[in-house]
Amino acid sequence: MSNTQLSYKDAGVDIHAGNELVERIKGDVKRTRRSEVMGGLGGFGALCALPTKYKEPILVSGTDGVGTKLRLAIDLKKHDTIGQDLVAMCVNDLIVQGAEPLFFLDYYATGKLDVDVAASVIKGIADGCEMSGCALVGGETAEMPGMYHEGDYDLAGFCVGVVEKSEIIDGTAVKTGDTLIALGSSGAHSNGYSLIRKVLEVSGANPTDLLEGKPLSEHFLAPTKIYVKSILQLIKQTEVHAIAHLTGGGFWENIPRVLPDNTKAVIDESSWQWPAIFNWLQEKGNISRYEMYRTFNCGVGMVIALPEKEVETALALLEQSGEKAWVIGKIEHLGEGEAQVEIQ
């Protein structure tokens, strides 16, 4: 038995550093506040009232991470936008059902807490919350010695939103003849990064190598686009039948999630050009066309199904919101033995 008096800090957990982090992020948390939020940081739980404008409010929840994009961000010491990625992955999943994000919580885990790094990450989370109009109401910062390599950390996010029951978007309204509108992505968003890192490895490319005048690192770490405010505006003023968020599984797996069983999406491949980074990945990794569309968004962040009569209004609204939007295809009847997504 040792006579040495031990403390939690001796075991690798610095409570003072955790408290310092809380003080550092208070301003970031404050700027995301919504009127429905009750209380501030430090409570055992966060309190949030339902917005009064809803007659029959339905809560919608989602949780996500950023995959191995985080590995790239850590290796390149780029911590200030990965938080936006985290928020985007959660709130974009809510908005496709018509839900307005209300509040967000994060989980940040590391072996040894670096206050500067953590504060930078959480500032990015607050930025994402501000962009999507949801409140950052709390989170968990876990310092766990022996669980992570030096300098590593992990992230997860959880978001709750609300939608009027009569206005839920679930794909059941999709009909043959509907038009499909695409919303442009900002890059690979937060999916396919294990393959991206493999391509970097086998190609011998350096993240500082230039592509269209920008380092590869800038292309790969471009923060995931948040579509919340644009889509909220769209669904207020047009009839939207379905929205698919193109994440893991790409076109082949995400679009069918919002289609009735008797319909298929026919995508016109000539309606857009892949951003240069996707052509680079396909060439350097010798990746098949099918695999590209299964792994990456290839420049398309969202696909929206709506009646043909709404197309002109929808495109104008989306353009006013700053989105790159175009007609990418249509909904047709699904024949026997056919796939629910065709890319022609």
Swiss-Prot record:
GO terms for biological process: 'de novo' IMP biosynthetic process; adenine biosynthetic process. It catalyses: 2-formamido-N(1)-(5-O-phospho-beta-D-ribosyl)acetamidine + ATP = 5-amino-1-(5-phospho-beta-D-ribosyl)imidazole + ADP + phosphate + H(+). This is Phosphoribosylformylglycinamidine cyclo-ligase. Keywords: ATP-binding, Cytoplasm, Ligase, Nucleotide-binding, Purine biosynthesis. SUPFAM superfamilies: PurM C-terminal domain-like (SSF56042), PurM N-terminal domain-like (SSF55326). GO terms for cellular component: cytosol. It comes from Haemophilus influenzae (strain PittGG). PANTHER family: TRIFUNCTIONAL PURINE BIOSYNTHETIC PROTEIN ADENOSINE-3 (PTHR10520:SF12), TRIFUNCTIONAL PURINE BIOSYNTHETIC PROTEIN ADENOSINE-3-RELATED (PTHR10520). It holds the Pfam family AIRS. Pathway: Purine metabolism; IMP biosynthesis via de novo pathway; 5-amino-1-(5-phospho-D-ribosyl)imidazole from N(2)-formyl-N(1)-(5-phospho-D-ribosyl)glycinamide: step 2/2. NCBIfam families: purM. Belongs to the AIR synthase family.
